[in-house]
C-alpha cells in the first residue's frame, strides 16, 4: 500500500481534525509529495499546518475552505494542484456533519445546510478536480458517506438522505469516468470517535480516526468501489440488501431492530444502534 501513496499529490477536506487529519498524516508517513489540508476551522488548520510542516518540510499546506461555497472549493483544489506542480492525484471529500433529530423538528433551513455540507460539497470537489484528472489521464476521488447510506436509522433521516445521495453519486461517477482513468470510491468509515459526536456519548463500538484512516487508505489503494472500514458496516449493508429482496428471516428481523432503535431514541438514548 505504501507505494501507492509515494510521491502523490492529495487534498483532504475536513482535514484538520478527526478522520481527515488521520488520512493526511498517514499519507505523509507513506511518502506523499504534497498534501493540502482543507478546513473551515482556522485555528485547527494553522496548528496542524505548522506541526506537520515541521515534520514534513515543504510537503503540507493548509487552505481555509468553506465547502458550502463552490468558489472556495475550486480555489482550494487549484491551490492543491499548484502546490503539487500542476497535478492532483487524490481528492478525499471528507468534510461533513453528523445529524440527528426528529423529522418534524427540522425545517428547510436545516435541510439546506445538511445538503450543502454533506452533499453539494462533494459535487463541488468533483467538479474542481475532474479537469486536472482527465487531463493527466488518472486520479482518484474518494467521497465519505456512512453506514447509514445502507442502514437508515430512525431519527437520522437528514443524515441518511445526504449520505445516501453521496453513495449514489459516487457509484454513478465511478463508471462514467472509468474510461477516462479517473477512479471513484465511496468511503464507509465506521463509527469513529471524533468531534462529530459533539460532546455526546460515543458508542462502545467506535474505532479511532487512525484505525479508520488505515482502512480508508488501504481500500483506496485497492480501488474498492465501496470502502467498508468495519465488518459491522459491511454486514449491515448486506443484511439490508438481502432484507429488501424479501429474505424471509432477515426482513422481519431488520424491521424489529430498527423499530427498537426508534423507540430507544424517542426516549432519549441516541447511542442506540
Where are these predicted regions, by residue range?
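Canonical Rossmann dinucleotide-binding motif of NAD(H)/NADP(H)-dependent dehydrogenases/reductases
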Residues: 2-36
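Conserved glycine-rich Rossmann-like NAD(P)H-binding loop of the short-chain dehydrogenase/reductase
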Residues: 32-48
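The beta1-alpha1 cofactor-binding region of Rossmann-like NAD(H)/NADP(H)-dependent oxidoreductases
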Residues: 42-43, 64-75, 108
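Substrate-binding pocket helix/loop in short-chain dehydrogenase/reductase
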Residues: 102-103, 107-112
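Active-site helix of classical SDR
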Residues: 126, 162
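Residue(s) in the substrate-gating loop at a strand-loop-helix junction
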Residues: 146
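SDR active-site lid
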Residues: 174-236, 242
Amino acid at each position: 500500500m505504501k507505494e501507492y501513496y509515494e510521491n502523490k499529490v492529495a487534498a483532504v477536506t475536513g482535514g484538520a481534525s478527526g478522520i481527515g487529519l488521520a488520512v493526511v498524516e498517514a499519507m505523509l508517513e507513506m511518502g506523499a509529495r504534497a498534501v493540502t489540508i482543507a478546513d473551515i476551522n482556522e485555528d485547527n488548520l494553522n496548528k496542524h499546518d505548522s506541526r506537520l510542516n515541521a515534520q514534513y518540510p515543504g510537503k503540507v499546506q493548509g487552505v481555509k475552505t468553506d465547502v458550502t461555497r463552490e468558489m472556495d472549493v475550486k480555489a482550494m483544489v487549484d491551490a492543491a494542484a499548484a502546490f503539487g506542480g500542476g497535478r492532483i492525484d487524490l481528492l478525499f471529500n471528507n468534510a461533513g456533519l453528523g445529524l440527528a433529530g426528529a423529522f418534524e423538528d427540522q425545517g428547510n433551513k436545516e435541510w439546506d445546510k445538511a445538503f450543502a455540507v454533506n452533499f453539494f460539497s462533494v459535487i463541488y470537489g468533483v467538479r474542481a478536480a475532474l479537469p486536472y484528472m482527465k487531463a493527466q489521464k488518472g486520479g482518484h476521488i474518494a467521497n465519505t458517506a456512512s453506514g447509514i447510506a445502507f442502514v437508515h436509522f430512525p431519527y437520522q433521516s437528514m443524515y441518511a438522505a445526504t449520505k445516501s445521495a453521496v453513495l449514489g453519486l459516487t457509484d454513478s461517477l465511478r463508471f462514467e469516468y472509468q474510461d477516462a482513468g479517473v477512479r471513484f470510491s465511496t468511503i464507509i468509515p465506521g463509527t469513529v470517535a471524533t468531534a462529530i459526536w459533539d460532546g455526546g456519548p460515543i458508542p462502545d463500538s467506535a474505532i479511532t480516526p487512525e484505525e479508520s484512516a488505515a482502512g480508508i487508505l488501504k481500500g483506496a489503494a485497492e480501488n474498492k468501489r465501496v470502502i467498508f472500514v468495519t465488518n459491522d458496516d459491511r454486514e449491515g449493508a448486506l443484511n439490508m440488501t438481502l432484507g429488501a429482496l424479501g429474505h424471509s428471516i432477515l426482513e422481519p428481523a431488520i424491521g424489529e431492530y430498527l423499530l427498537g432503535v426508534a423507540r430507544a431514541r424517542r426516549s432519549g438514548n441516541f447511542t442506540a444502534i
